[in-house]
Curated annotation (Swiss-Prot):
Name this polypeptide is given: Phosphatidylinositol 4,5-bisphosphate 3-kinase catalytic subunit delta isoform
GO molecular function terms attached to this record: 1-phosphatidylinositol-3-kinase activity; 1-phosphatidylinositol-4,5-bisphosphate 3-kinase activity; 1-phosphatidylinositol-4-phosphate 3-kinase activity; ATP binding
Database matches in PANTHER family: PHOSPHATIDYLINOSITOL 4,5-BISPHOSPHATE 3-KINASE CATALYTIC SUBUNIT DELTA ISOFORM, PHOSPHATIDYLINOSITOL KINASE
Organism listed in the record: Homo sapiens (Human)
Domain C2 PI3K-type: from-to ranges: 319-476
Length: 1044
């Protein structure tokens, strides 16, 4: 066989009409070689191969084509079975153009699903098998059964319940949405256009915004009966309403004005277009989308119960000797030979150190340093908590200077962290680990606190075993039989014997003062002792202070742990806010976690969706694969497809991170097994994203040597290929699964001028009528996680304001990371940047920033006549909302290119690269000189172009103050959500200082009156100092003339 030519990924993205010569190896040993279209799918290629093979020797020895499957070597140098024969060759992207045909083995349906899951989650399922890890295998079996049972239950749902699963309602946050200054009026007449499924005839008639969908459908049926002169026999209860051109339905006992789609139509002055869909169509959809029957075998019988622990096991609590380990040696250690190597070890329960850390002796640097040293900890084995983790840090120290003046502090500064690793002391079945363990370590990242140990890091070994530094340790055999942590009944038995204490009135007052103290700073030792002593009082009178009590519990004393867990059994259920706090890393105990999840079960789907990002991040804190949070998220995702969609993408976007790839991959596998139809929808999105990445790489390369117009032409040429058009058309938007990305409008697609050349992709959808234009921005090379978090918080603020009847016309556009520095951003149509508006109304970039009339004139041109008053009101409300939001979140780097205005008048901010007060500096000087952006041209619009329209301005100030006051009332919610997001590892959200910014901006240590006074000072400062913003904008305009 001639030597093959390797095919890098770029090779497969060339024009489709080019064919590629492929080498084929048949099971009979026959070799064939002929050209095929890179655009052909594997099924077509197999037919071509069969046609040619019949003229070759030994053809009679072959079975039918369906008995064989192609294999290839993929781009990661692995052999891959290509079970899905609808995939195109250019999408398979084999490393060499060589396809080998092998006999199929095993269950084809099962293998096809496994192959599709592997492709979708970005990790081969065979990698999970090859780990031979009992915890992984048990988790997979348990979750597979859990998810398949959920799928079977879903298949039995009635049409209305199935509709709720597949197309959850999209409602405004509350019925009281008629906020001050908004233009919606209660009980307003509304014209709607309704057609019946399968018919092109449509009817337009008037209903009230207070009517429920059932009333609208009854009107439509009466109208149809009148027009066609037929008797009225059909019942409205047998129908539901679909929004035309969208995967969105209106149903339930909600007034029409509470549906987001109807609200958007009211605001934009458009007529809602709806389709009446019969229940039989919904049931047909359900049956078509049901999971295939369990593969061949009968419904799985429940596994036999785990045998009870044999009497030959030993209870941990019976072992009173100190805990010790042996440090044997290291390997693959890379450090300066002039230094010495040291290992530090510590025992942690969450953030709490259980005893003093211990350090090894110093040894000379070499690749395989040897210690053979016993490390003893100041804690008895019986006092080790169930979730204790052993943390190691390997670091180098410069040999101590010979000068007598050298101080300990100086020598500590010379510590050079190399790597860290963590290990749970108990396995997932509660057994104390023993024997030799090789810990593959993670490279250390310098920490501003100078901490060497990393207790919040993963307990998984670094999978990069070829190059990672490693430590070989030995956990001693402490008893003749396996040692187990006591079962819950034994713990409760010990905890029951807690003595009752007499509480004085003075102690009760002290307790109240400690627990009601603003801010949750560190308590003094005597305060901790008092809270613990009065724990029954805390349970009875301050149950929401459970977190405080858990933090003062001595987790290195098994009697106290037993008493705390006994108390937890009868603790009243917590409100959601307090339960969220318990998911933080500071509370690792599994019983505490289960209690928190029990309290979170009351979350509505909309509330869960609002906090989903944080809940996914705190999965990183979990010590074992099987935990209540994972089951809770899977359970809810399999009962609501929108939650399933976003759970999938939040997990999938981090599959490139080695420390979470195993956990996230296993959860993704379980979700896919519980929703095989949704898996196909997600695969379509994955294919589109793959094509967009290839397109973006091509554009980046081309734009280096070719002017933009020619590069744009080449981009369009590439997009017109059949493989691209097919992949990029007719898919649900990853940003919002109810949005259908129908036909890609190649001529309207372009790329932006910024460094990473983001793609601007436009879609049209005829069915959706005038609202059918949709745009997405594909970014490749930028981390969108901080933008997503900021937009999530702005959306949460919008919800909280609307619940109080204040609609500030915010625009929290969609933003979703989908992979390693890749993601999508929603295009807000009919909008422009302030920079462009100012530059287009000025002759010079230098004077543009000082043109106070530019914004108002632009709004006048877009909103003639009476529409201008409405546009100015929209501007006023949204400007108030973003002033408060950007101040509270400390959003920096604000200039005229990242503040935009919609033609309707709504102002909004984009690009959130800096937040929580991490402002840009230049030459050490802070460039952000104002609390938020409130320039004179904004005030000019708010005052309708009049210089002394103080009434309008005071109304604007009132909106700001009311918005700020509402956010303060929910201050703890923001603190908890940001605290949970520390698990994400964002550079600007890594320590308590970043959270402190929020406490300060919301003035959480002050009374409401003091806080409002504080905000007024900031408001006046923003107004007074707005000339500085103008100077910044002038500099920005001059350095980057934005005129297109």
């Amino acid at each position: 066989m001639p030597p093959g030519v390797d095919c890098p990924m770029e090779f497969w993205t060339k024009e489709e009409n080019q064919s590629v010569v492929v080498d084929f190896l048949l099971p009979t040993g026959v070799y064939l070689n002929f050209p095929v279209s890179r655009n052909a799918n594997l099924s077509t290629i197999k037919q071509l191969l069969w046609h040619r093979a019949q003229y070759e020797p030994l053809f009679h020895m072959l079975s039918g084509p369906e008995a064989y499957v192609f294999t290839c070597i993929n781009q990661t140098a692995e052999q891959q079975e290509l079970e899905d024969e609808q995939r195109r060759l250019c999408d398979v992207q084999p490393f060499l153009p060589v396809l080998r045909l092998v006999a199929r083995e095993g269950d084809r349906v099962k293998k096809l699903i496994n192959s599709q899951i592997s492709l979708l989650i970005g990790k081969g399922l065979h990698e999970f098998d090859s780990l031979c890890d009992p915890e992984v295998n048990d988790f997979r079996a348990k979750m597979c059964q859990f998810c398949e049972e959920a799928a079977a239950r879903r298949q039995q749902l009635g049409w209305e319940a199935w509709l709720q699963y597949s197309f959850p309602l999209q409602l405004e946050p509350s019925a009281q949405t008629w906020g001050p200054g908004t233009l919606r009026l209660p009980n307003r007449a509304l014209l709607v256009n309704v057609k019946f499924e399968g018919s092109e005839e449509s009817f337009t008639f008037q209903v009230s915004t207070k009517d429920v969908p059932l009333a609208l459908m009854a009107c439509a049926l009466r109208k149809k009966a009148t027009v066609f002169r037929q008797p009225l026999v059909e019942q409205p209860e047998d129908y539901t309403l679909q929004v035309n051109g969208r995967h969105e339905y209106l149903y339930g006992s909600y007034p029409l004005c509470q549906f987001q789609y109807i609200c958007s139509c009211l605001h934009s002055g458009l007529t809602p277009h709806l389709t009446m869909v019969h229940s039989s169509s919904i049931l047909a959809m359900r049956d078509e989308q049901s999971n295939p029957a369990p593969q061949v075998q009968k419904p799985r019988a429940k596994p036999p119960p785990i045998p009870a622990k044999k009497p030959s096991s030993v209870s941990l609590w019976s072992l009173e000797q100190p805990f010790r380990i042996e440090l044997i040696q290291g390997s693959k250690v890379n450090a300066d030979e002039r230094m010495k190597l040291v290992v530090q070890a510590g025992l942690f329960h969450g953030n709490e150190m259980l005893c003093k850390t211990v350090s090894s002796s110093e040894v000379s640097v070499c690749s395989e340093p040897v210690w053979k040293q016993r490390l003893e900890f100041d804690i008895n084995i019986c006092d080790l908590p169930r979730m204790a983790r052993l943390c190691f840090a390997l670091y180098a120290v410069i040999e101590k200077a010979k000068k007598a003046r050298s101080t300990k502090k100086k020598s500590k500064k010379a510590d050079c962290p190399i790597a860290w690793a963590n290990l749970m002391l108990f396995d997932y079945k509660d057994q104390l680990k023993t024997g030799e363990r090789c810990l593959y370590m993670w490279p250390s990242v310098p920490d501003e606190k100078g901490e060497l140990l990393n207790p919040t890091g993963t307990v998984r070994s670094n999978p990069n075993t070829d190059s990672a530094a490693a430590l070989l340790i030995c956990l001693p055999e402490v008893a003749p039989h396996p040692v187990y942590y006591p079962a819950l009944e034994k713990i409760l038995e010990l905890g029951r014997h807690s003595e009752c204490v007499h509480v004085t009135e003075e102690e009760q007052l002290q307790l109240r003062e400690i627990l009601e103290r603003r801010g949750s700073g560190e308590l003094y030792e005597h305060e901790k002792d008092l809270v613990w002593k009065l724990r029954h009082e805390v349970q009875e009178h301050f149950p929401e202070a459970l977190a405080r009590l858990l933090l003062v519990t001595k987790w290195n004393k098994h009697e106290d742990v037993a008493q705390m867990l006994y108390l937890l059994c009868s603790w009243p259920e917590l409100p959601v806010l307090s339960a969220l706090e318990l998911l933080d890393f500071s509370f690792p105990d599994c019983h505490v976690g289960s209690f928190a999840i029990k309290s979170l079960r009351k979350l509505t789907d909309d509330e869960l969706f609002q906090y989903l990002l944080q809940l996914v991040q705190v999965l990183k804190y979990e010590s074992y694969l099987d935990c209540e949070l994972t089951k809770f998220l899977l359970d809810r995702a399999l009962a609501n497809r929108k939650i399933g969609h976003f759970l999938f993408w939040h997990l999938r976007s981090e599959m490139h991170v080695p420390s979470v790839a195993l956990r996230f991959g296993l959860i993704l596998e379980a979700y896919c097994r519980g929703s095989t139809h949704h898996m196909k929808v997600l695969m379509k999105q994955g294919e589109a994203l793959s094509k967009l990445k290839a397109l973006n790489d091509f554009v980046k390369l081309s734009s280096q040597k070719t002017p933009k117009p020619q590069t744009k032409e080449l981009m369009h040429l590439c997009m017109r290929q059949e493989a691209y058009l097919e992949a990029l058309s007719h898919l649900q938007s990853p940003l919002d699964p109810s949005t259908l990305l129908a036909e890609v409008c190649v001529e309207q697609c372009t790329f932006m001028d910024s460094k990473m050349k983001p793609l601007w992709i436009m879609y049209s959808n005829e069915e959706a009528g005038s609202g059918g234009s949709v745009g997405i921005i594909f970014k490749n090379g930028d981390d969108l996680r901080q933008d997503m978090l900021t937009l999530q918080m702005i959306q949460l603020m919008d919800v909280l304001w609307k619940q109080e009847g204040l609609d500030l016309r915010m625009t929290p556009y969609g933003c979703l990371p989908t992979g390693d520095r890749t993601g999508l951003i929603e295009v807000v149509l009919r909008s422009d940047t302030i920079a462009n508006i100012q530059l287009n109304k000025s002759n010079m970039a230098a004077t543009a920033a000082f043109n106070k009339d530019a914004l108002l004139n632009w709004l006048k041109s877009k909103n003639p006549g009476e529409a201008l008053d409405r546009a100015i009101e929209e501007f006023t409300l949204s400007c108030a909302g973003y002033c408060v939001a950007t101040y509270v979140l400390g959003i920096g780097d604000r200039h005229s290119d990242n503040i935009m205005i919609r033609e309707s008048g709504q102002l909004f901010h984009i690009d959130f690269g800096h937040f929580l007060g991490n402002f840009k500096t230049k030459f050490g000087i802070n460039r952000e000189r104002v609390p938020f952006i409130l320039t004179y041209d904004f005030v000019h619009v708010i005052q309708q172009g009049k210089t002394n329209n103080s009434e309008k301005f005071e109304r604007f100030r009132g909106y700001c103050e009311r918005a700020y006051t509402i956010l303060r009332r929910h201050g703890l919610l923001f603190l908890h959500l940001f605290a949970l997001m520390r698990a994400a590892g964002l550079p600007e959200l890594s320590c308590s200082k970043d959270i402190q910014y929020l406490k300060d901006s919301l003035a959480l240590g002050k009374t409401e009156e003091e806080a409002l006074k504080h905000f007024r000072v900031k408001f006046n400062e923003a107004l007074r100092e707005s000339w500085k913003t103008k100077v910044n904008w002038l500099a920005h305009n001059v350095s980057k003339d934005n005129r297109q």
